[in-house]
Amino acid sequence: MIDYYAPIIPYVGMAGILLYSKEEEVNKIVSLDNAEKKILNDKWIRYDIDNAVELFFHKINGKLFRITTLEDYKGKLFEKIKVGMTVEDLIEYDSSFYYDEFEEVYESDKGIFIETDPQTNTVKWISVYIKELDDKNFDDGQWWYKFFRNGILNRTRKIGNHPWTTPIC
């Protein structure tokens, strides 16, 4: 079950779901069978779940590489930033965000990008993603193997009041 109030944690996850998880692992938390599945291109699959989150999986390795909030998600980034807040409040709270004209999103080097509604000037979506998303070789799908080699999988993390288990390869 999705935790609509879980914190949004850059490079880690949100909604009680961890980045780098496999589809089968996420399916144990939330039924992907009931989610709207979209094949975005020959390498990406997206699941839209309960108007709360979008999950982006890489087709080559089956790993979750991006999670995006939708309208019904209530969790916060850095205990303050949330869907529906104004862009002015976003920038006031964290001045590291800058607007990327090409992508049309606010970005931060902290592993987040935020899409806004230009008519209301409010935060529409918040995305967290894996560090490798910006790598030139991201599409080859080999990025997750370094975590397996480095032995950092299969550990339990407690983040706030949310104990999340790092996914198994």
Annotate each PLM feature.
Residues 1-169:
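Short helix/turn-capping signatures at newly exposed starts of structured segments
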